[in-house]
UniProtKB/Swiss-Prot annotation:
Subcellular location: Cell membrane
Name used for this protein in its record: Steroid transmembrane transporter SLC22A24
Organism placement in taxonomy: Eukaryota, Metazoa, Chordata, Craniata, Vertebrata
Biological role: Renal transmembrane organic anion/dicarboxylate exchanger that participates in the reabsorption of conjugated steroids including estradiol-17beta-D-glucuronide (or 17beta-estradiol 17-O-(beta-D-glucuronate)), androstanediol glucuronide (or 5alpha-androstane-3alpha,17beta-diol 3-O-(beta-D-glucuronate)), and estrone 3-sulfate, as well as bile acids taurocholate and glycocholate, driven by an outward gradient of dicarboxylates such as glutarate or succinate.
Membrane topology annotation: Multi-pass membrane protein
Catalytic reaction equation(s): estrone 3-sulfate(out) + glutarate(in) = estrone 3-sulfate(in) + glutarate(out); 17beta-estradiol 17-O-(beta-D-glucuronate)(out) + glutarate(in) = 17beta-estradiol 17-O-(beta-D-glucuronate)(in) + glutarate(out); taurocholate(out) + glutarate(in) = taurocholate(in) + glutarate(out); 5alpha-androstane-3alpha,17beta-diol 3-O-(beta-D-glucuronate)(out) + glutarate(in) = 5alpha-androstane-3alpha,17beta-diol 3-O-(beta-D-glucuronate)(in) + glutarate(out)
Cited InterPro entries: MFS_dom (IPR020846), MFS_sugar_transport-like (IPR005828), MFS_trans_sf (IPR036259)
Main localisation: membrane
The keyword rRNA-binding belongs to this UniProt entry's keyword annotation: no
Amino acid sequence: MGFDVLLDQVGGMGRFQICLIAFFCIANILLFPNIVLENFTAFTPGHRCWVPLLDNDTVSDNDTGTLSKDDLLRISIPLDSNLRPQKCQRFIHPQWQLLHLKGTFPNTNETDTEPCVDGWVYDRTSFLSTIVTEWDLVCESQSLKSMVQSLFMAGSLLGGLIYGHLSDRVGRKIICKLCFLQLAISNTCAAFAPTFLVYCILRFLAGFSTMTILGNTFILSLEWTLPQSRSMAIMVLLCSYSVGQMLLGGLAFAIQDWRVLQLTVSTPIIVLFLSSWKMVESARWLIINNQLDEGLKELRRVAHTNGKKNTEETLTAEVIWKGEMIAVIK
C-alpha cells in the first residue's frame, strides 16, 4: 500500500483539500504583493533641484518682478539634451540673460552649475510619498533604490535555503507559522522605519520568510492531494499570484503614501499568522519521520472532514505498516 492509496481512502480531493487550497490561495494573494511592493513604494517621481527663487517662501514677488514660475525655473536650472530641466544640477547664480531682458535684472555670465545641495522638489502627482522622496534616493544615491529589492531577493534566497532545510527537519507547519510571524513583524515595522538602513534590514527579513511560505504552500498542497489532482492545485495556486499583483495595483492607485501602503499589505499577515495555528502537518512527512501517531491523527482528521467515517474508524498503525508502507513512502 502506497501513501497515495491511503490518501485516496481518506479522501484524495474532498472538502479538506478544497479548504486547504482555498486557504493557501488567500495566503498567496495577501503575500505576493510583498514581493513586488517596491514597484510602487520605491517609485521615482519627476524631480529637480530646490532653488531659492522658486521654493523659498521668504522670497517676495518684489524680488522676482512679474516673472512666471517657468521663467524662474529657466534661469535657475540648466536644460538637458531633451531641453528639459536637469534633475541633478542647478545654476550657482541665476542666469537672467537667458530671458533676454536687458536692464531689468543684473546680468551675469557665470554659468557654473552645482549639485542639488539644498535637496530636491518632487512631482507628487502620482504618489504623495515614496521611499525615494522620503530619503532622497535620486542622483548620486539612486543606486540605493535597487539595493532594497536586491536585499529582499537575497533574503528570499537565504531564507529558502535555511528554512527549506528546517522544514524537512522539524516539519512544514511549524516553519510556516514561524515565517508568518516573522513576516508580520518585519513588514509592519518597515512601515514605521525611521531610516533607510532600518528599512533595508526589515525588508531583508521580510524576504527571508516570504518565499519560504510560498514554497511550503506548494509542498503541503502537493502532499495532501492525489497525483491526478496536483496539476489543478498548482494551476490554482499560480493564478492566486496574479490576483495578488492586481490587488496591489488597486491598492497603490488608492493609497498614495508609501507608509500607509506598506502597513495595508502587512496587516493581513497578522490574520494569516493567527489562522496558521489550525493548519495541518503533512501526514507523509510525519510518517517518514517515524511520528506514526501524529500521522494517524492527521489522517483521521482529514477522513472526518471529508466524511469518510468508516476509514476514520478502521485507520490504524497496522494498516499503515502493512505492505512495508514506510519503505514505499520513502
